[in-house]
């Protein structure tokens, strides 16, 4: 596993973004882990978050793209900090764009989008925190493709939970890839998280001990993707 991925896993734990215990998800599933990207709240955290996304995007998709698109709401700050980090790390100027939940009907920037306008020929990388159902892409992809003749290069999320979507045996990322025809990737997978944190001390404690590891294993026996 690359060094930046190991650092990112520990960064999520240190930032209180990735937690282990017992959580009820929106789907109703009882999960032994939970990720909340809304816990990134400081300037230094957001700066580092952008750098991790930029590294993963550069490694996966290169720099042949024009726009980073972050769906509202959590995708907005992620797309902004990643655009800054991409320029700082790779000297590449990319634009950011996001959609609005409610269309703005006044001012110079009225409409359904904020940030850069999408143009014919743009190559777009989508950014999200985590995708469990694919619902946000269901809403966003038609918007993006409907406003201009763009190419969606791929999607990058923080964490691939590696579990079945609500509609079948495939993960949300697999379903998105098959439905919309672009690549889907994550900075890290849950398998990599467990591999790195199991019986490892982080912030003075073992984050994934035998009990939590057993709970994760049981969860994936029921909900894991092949």
Where are these regions (language model features)?
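PRPP-associated nucleotide enzymes
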Residues: 1-127, 132-226
